[in-house]
Amino acid sequence: MSKRIQAKHKLDRRLGQNIWGRPKSPVNRREYGPGQHGQRRKGKLSDFGTQLRAKQKLKGYYANITEKQFRRYYAEAIRLRGDSGENLVGLLERRLDAVVYRSKFVATPFAARQFVNHGHIRVNGQRVNIPSYLVKPGDVIEVKESSKQLEIVVVASQLAERDVPDYIEADHGKMTARFTRVPTLSEVPYPVHMEPNQVIEFYSR
């Protein structure tokens, strides 16, 4: 088992939730945390503990982005008008790797980050290899012609479920997608309940 897979399993067990909705998640078999003390009875979380867990869950879901990046999203979310929690989710869903994943060009958020890093994606006709690049409404994302037959893409194309959220218009025949608008929290198809306002409270302490 690779270190990355082990890290995913460890986070799932620590949180007690299958945050990526993976069939092989260890929490599908056991609900206690990792390590020798994982089976101890869990007490009620403090406000800080609840906020920390919400942060770990949301940050981990997006291929475990760095703390530095996540703090930048928080700073931008509170600067923007409107609900800061909604703003935070909107910023995360605008990440290029998130849009690639939501478009179902690849099977997982981690695969999407790698796919973008390796230069397989164009935005409005221009090659972009930065996973954190923020897509704007109206932007068109496409898989490079030479990358369409890669195994990672072919495997995703064979998935039975290729549901794409309403804020993305995807053409899987052409391997293109248009980001139509910034979504609200209720529109984002998270496998588990996310609490972005708890994340805002965590950083506001």
UniProtKB/Swiss-Prot annotation:
Instruction: Extract the GO molecular function terms from the UniProt entry.
Output: rRNA binding; structural constituent of ribosome
The record's disulfide annotation reads none
- Claim: RNA-binding is one of the keywords in the record: yes
Q: Would you tell me the Gene Ontology cellular component terms?
A: small ribosomal subunit
GO biological processes: ribosomal small subunit biogenesis; translation
Q: Which residue range or ranges hold the S4 RNA-binding domain?
A: 94-156
- Please verify whether the record's keywords include Glycoprotein: no
Keywords attached to this Swiss-Prot or TrEMBL record, sorted alphabetically, are: Ribonucleoprotein, Ribosomal protein, RNA-binding, rRNA-binding
Record's superkingdom?
Answer: Bacteria
Q: Where is this region: Disordered?
A: 15-48
Fetch the NCBIfam families from UniProt.
PRK05327.1, rpsD_bact
Q: Which family does it belong to?
A: Belongs to the universal ribosomal protein uS4 family.
How does this chain assemble?
A: Part of the 30S ribosomal subunit. Contacts protein S5. The interaction surface between S4 and S5 is involved in control of translational fidelity.
Alphabetized PANTHER family for the sequence: 30S 40S RIBOSOMAL PROTEIN, SMALL RIBOSOMAL SUBUNIT PROTEIN US4M
Q: Quote the HAMAP family the UniProt record gives.
A: Ribosomal_uS4_B
What functional role does this protein have?
One of the primary rRNA binding proteins, it binds directly to 16S rRNA where it nucleates assembly of the body of the 30S subunit.
Q: What is this protein called?
A: Small ribosomal subunit protein uS4
Which species is this UniProt entry from?
Methylobacterium sp. (strain 4-46)
Its gene?
A: rpsD
